[in-house]
Amino acid sequence: WDTFSHTPGKVDNGDTGDVACDHYHRWPEDLGIAGQLGLDAYRFSIAWPRIVPQADGRVNQAGLDFYDRLTDSLLEKGITPFPTLYHWDLPQAQQDRGGWPVRETAERFGEYAEVVAAALGDRITNWATLNEPLCSAWIGHLDGNMAPGLKDLTAAVRASYHLHLGHGLAVQALRAAIPNASIGIVNNLSPVHPATDSESDRLAAQRGDGHINRWWLDPILGRGYPQDMVELYGVELPVHPGDMELISAPLDWIGLNYYFRQIVTGDTTGPAPHFRQVPGPNVEHTAMDWEVHGPGLEQLLLRLTDDYGVQKIYVTENGSAYQDTVGADGSVHDPERTEYLEQHLAACARAVSKGAPLAGYFAWSLLDNFEWAYGYDKRFGLVHVDYKTQQRTVKTSGRRYAELAAAHRLRGRRAA
């Protein structure tokens, strides 16, 4: 991503992630804010390039030391660490050797997981292997809008497979090093609906569901790759003996990232997967132009519960971007985000009442941050960041979220 963000035309406004919200230097202040908001868990990612920057496996101890300090401080504050091993930041040296389309990257990821587990496993129980592998594979290798910026179906499918294999190898490494580890994977999922009742749109919705949801759930939950999508992609999966057993190793929980539903129509003008998203009917959209649709979160929680038999779920990301501004009094009023949070927490409460084993909810995000290809224009944080001064200001949504976190209750109902 460092290389990608420094490539002209890849990120809005020419923004890069060089400094972003400078959490690397300001983490004590940021954890202090998390404590003030009453958060009892903190989800963060560990940067593979900080730990093993080169392809030779040499460990950068300074990188590990940062996460060591972060972990100890979280525990001192009574905040449970929830690290993710991979949030899209592949070492450039590994990309130069082929990246996720080649098997070596999955193997190196397993070795990196061993290093991190050995360093932090004595204090951290809860682990996620991958965050939104769909984005790494489909958006990075098929759509070309994220690193490494390819538009190659074969590379995308092979990347998806090796991401799953890397997940399995990481699970193996974590289990070996941390006997009491609670391990999951984080997928961004969306309910997919046909735009009309036509056969073409219904088939498009089936393909969309396969591309967005089933391809990412079925293999890790023991169902194998969905055959309709294997045939649609027409790319041979590079399966070796024993791979599928690794990929489908038992997990302790599933992480669900939810932002919007997808309404689709058929589109066979380009390569697979032959569907195109169309605008939803709701008039309310976020600054990302994403439709606000809380019931979709309830639907996904119940699908994981009823269709897949998942025994423990975390909502690992849910949030919204709006055009926040700092008022003359120095405060940031964002009633739209507050309403968004309450609507989606209500969806969680409904799902729990219907049997969903929801164990926790993480808002995206604590701070405004570098929003990948969108740069710094899109603000998701409960805390406003002035990128020129790095001043943090808790938004009104952050204060409301703190109230909800303290009460575990929303409008008379117990929230997740």
Where are these regions (language model features)?
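Active-site region of glycoside hydrolase catalytic domains
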Residues: 2-11, 54-55, 65-416
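N-terminal structural segment of carbohydrate-active enzymes
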Residues: 1-60, 64, 70-73, 77
